[in-house]
Amino acid sequence: GYAIYDSVKDYYFGYYENNYETYAALTARHFNAQYHCTAKSGIGIMVSWFPMIMPEMYDRLDATDSTSKWDFSKYTPDVVVINLLQNDSWIVTMSDQPEFKHRFGTAAPTESEVIDAYKKFVQTIRDTYPKSQIICMLGNMDITKKGSPWPGYVDDAVKQLHDKKIFTFFSPYKDTYGHPKVREQKAMADGLIKFIDENIKW
């Protein structure tokens, strides 16, 4: 819910954020589903705006403590939604950004490296939840803008996994400034709800 309430500056301040009104929480409430969310504003699969990526964080109880591990046996979801890569898609073009240098050195990842990194993380989630249905989603920022290669990367990764219980869903590009606001989160939720109704058997 980064900047969900800030329609002017798109600021990161906490009082502009609210997970309760995000597409994920809205979707869970629609289905009266138990909601378990692992998220951090600015995080990516290969690179983030800070020195941690989702493959390093997803299994932590305390995101700031690498020794604090979540016990996955406590909860097994029927459906897992993975919505990542928006931050990667920006930072991989910023060779002067500190985290670019930290993760990649001087050369941006190739298309095959992006696909492999995404595929590896999805496989990790599959190994964690062997029976869950997984939706590989992209949100409605510029990652789904016409001409973006990133939906293709996700499609390729999922195809290579050969898993009939892993799906893709890409929200239509919102074509507005900044991060999704309340109305745009609702639009994402509506799309995801429709996709789940049409494709997921609970």
Give the location of each predicted region:
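Generic structural signal for well-ordered alpha-helices
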Residues: 118-123, 155
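Short glycine-rich catalytic loops that host catalytic nucleophiles or stabilize transition states
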Residues: 169-174
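A short helix->loop->beta-strand "cap" motif at the edges of active sites that frequently abuts
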Residues: 129-134
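Short helix-capping segments at alpha-helix termini
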Residues: 159-164
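Surface-exposed acidic, glycine-flexible loop patches that form ligand/cofactor-binding
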Residues: 67-76, 123-128, 199-202
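Conserved SGNH/GDSL esterase-like catalytic core that processes O-acyl groups on lipids
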Residues: 2-3, 8-107, 142-148, 152, ...
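Histidine-centered active-site loop/cap adjacent to the catalytic His
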Residues: 177-202
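Aromatic/hydrophobic pocket-lining residues that form the small-molecule binding cavity
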Residues: 114, 118, 185
